[in-house]
Swiss-Prot record:
It holds the Pfam family p450. InterPro entries: Cyt_P450 (IPR001128), Cyt_P450_CS (IPR017972), Cyt_P450_E_grp-I (IPR002401), Cyt_P450_sf (IPR036396), Plant_Cytochrome_P450_Monoox (IPR050651). The gene is CYP81F1. Its main location: membrane. This is Cytochrome P450 81F1. The chain crosses the membrane at residues 1-21. Its cofactor is heme. The keyword Ribonucleoprotein does not apply. Pathway: Secondary metabolite biosynthesis. Gene3D superfamilies: Cytochrome P450. It comes from Arabidopsis thaliana. One of its GO terms (biological process) is indole glucosinolate metabolic process.
Length: 500
């Protein structure tokens, strides 16, 4: 018995000594004092992006941490982000650190978001950009986005009329409405099914699917010690068992959806297109590859868009002058006789600025998705050894007072400075940057901007009287609003025309 206790401890001591001796060879960025074996894991209390910002204030725009046996480098500077995401550095830094969640949920790190840099990832990226997320294909699915937004507006209008016959303001909770909108948008594009609202398919499966997406986001954002202290696996791992069960449940749903699309040979969905490619190249387009692409689309395009919309509406309610300015722009440019369309977004710069300001203050991936270099490299003059976990604290960059005037203020007018979009490339990074930029960025921006513009155009909005809005963020990969958004709304006259 004593042998089985001492052997792991001996292994831990040897590993620590080995790691420490290797560290001495490198000129690593500065960082706070660490504890033996655990490093800084004991300090990682949520919200982690705020903690990392405090460390950057103390140690500078690049600093080191240690999570168990893993080195971590945190970047909090646009210039260092640019250095990391351009040229040869971007190639070296285009891999992902291996994590338990990705192992069991993302088909052993083979999805576009989790795969190591190499031929397989490049193929997946090409499929995303050319086959399922191309401008042509997004235009083909425009009718789905338009239909789902109209359904949401109609549902909200009927609810206000049912709850309030005097046409006064009605109290609503926005999170379920926005969540149903974004889930239906993506699931219809991917599989052709509607899960939420009216005319739905399989409510039980729908609720399980939404729960799994939420669980995956929470577990992906978890700073779990088993990822950094492998020796803990010898003592059993509840986290690993839970993640494995989540991955199995998600795979079961994805396989059912794939089989349904395979039976529907006339379907015009992203999955049907991938099935046609599978028939041409069965050796590459396996079911696992297709399910991985399905999951990537659904995880990246559902929860994230709903969270962004909720933050946007929260900020508009806290800043009624911004809401009024956005509404006036829509009324002036679009009129009051028809619903805003995707083609109108180009002539609504203030609405676009509102979305950009929401991305700045409330990025759904506050420190992006971590990367890991495939070779030793340098950033900011410091050594970054191979396999280091590199995190870019976009949340802190977005709120840096040296970059942004009054950084905590929600001010869409700040983008009217004439600097142009290139000026903000490494100052505003809600979708990441470089080779691992989110391939669904264009789709996400379309959904968020069109839905937000429609809510502004079709309803009057007020904050709930007597309630002080809590703007705290929750834990997890997607930076949800801790307290679900409640608001008062009333249909504008345009809604009566839309419902005719």
């Amino acid at each position: 018995m004593l042998y089985f206790i001492l052997l792991p401890l001996l292994f831990l001591v040897i590993s620590y000594k080995f790691l420490y001796s290797k560290t001495q060879r490198f000129n690593l960025p500065p960082g706070p004092p660490s504890r033996p074996f655990v490093g800084h894991l004991h300090l990682m209390k949520p919200p982690i992006h705020r903690l990392l910002q405090r460390y950057s204030n103390q140690y500078g725009p690049i600093f080191s941490l240690r999570f168990g046996s893993r080195r971590v480098v945190v970047i909090t500077s646009p210039s260092l982000a640019q250095e990391s995401f351009t040229g040869q550095n971007d190639i070296v830094l285009s891999s992902r650190p291996l994590q338990l969640t990705a192992k069991y949920v993302a088909y052993n790190h083979t999805t576009v978001g989790t795969a190591p840099y190499g031929d397989h990832w490049r193929n997946l990226r090409r499929i995303c950009s050319q086959e399922i997320l191309s401008s042509h294909r997004l235009i083909n699915f425009q009718h789905i986005r338009k239909d789902e937004i109209l359904r949401m507006l109609t549902r909200l209008s009927r609810y206000t009329q049912t709850s309030n016959e005097s046409n006064d303001f009605t109290h609503i909770e926005l999170e379920p409405l926005l969540s149903d909108l974004t889930f239906n948008n993506i699931v219809r594009m991917v599989t052709g099914k509607r899960y939420y609202g009216d005319d739905v398919n399989n409510k039980e499966e729908a609720e399980l699917f939404k729960k799994l997406v939420y669980d995956i986001a929470m577990y992906s954002g978890a700073n779990h010690s088993a990822d950094y202290l492998p020796i803990l696996k010898l003592f059993g791992n509840k986290f690993e068992k839970e993640v494995k069960a989540i991955g199995k449940s998600m795979d079961d749903i994805l396989q059912r959806l794939l089989d349904e699309c395979r039976r529907d040979k006339e379907g015009n969905t992203m999955v049907n297109h991938l099935i046609s490619l599978q028939q041409q190249q069965p050796e590459y387009y396996t079911d696992v590859i297709i399910k991985g692409l399905m999951m990537s689309m659904m995880l990246a395009g559902t929860e994230t868009s709903a969270v962004t919309l909720e933050w946007a509406m929260a900020n508009l309610l806290r800043n009624p002058e911004v809401l009024e300015k956005a509404r006036s722009e829509i009324d002036e440019k679009i009129g009051k006789d028809r619903l805003i369309d995707e083609s109108d977004i180009a002539v609504l710069p203030y609405l676009q600025n509102v979305v950009s300001e929401t991305f700045r203050l409330f990025p759904v991936a506050p420190f992006l998705i971590p990367r890991s270099p495939t070779d030793d490299m340098k950033i900011g003059g410091y050594d970054v050894p191979r396999d280091t976990i590199v995190m870019v604290n976009a949340w802190a960059i977005h709120r840096d007072p040296e970059i942004w005037e009054e950084p905590e203020k929600f001010n869409p007018d700040r983008y009217n400075d004439g600097c142009g979009s290139d000026y903000y490339v490494y100052k505003l990074m809600p979708f990441g940057n470089g080779r691992r930029t989110c391939p669904g960025a264009g789709l996400g921006q379309r959904i968020v901007t069109l839905a937000l513009g429609s809510l502004i155009q079709c309803f009057e909005w007020e904050n709930v009287k007597g309630e002080e809005m809590d703007m705290s963020e929750s834990t997890g990969l997607g930076m949800r609003k801790m307290d679900p958004l409640r608001a008062m709304c009333r249909p504008r006259p345009i809604m009566s025309k839309l419902l005719l």
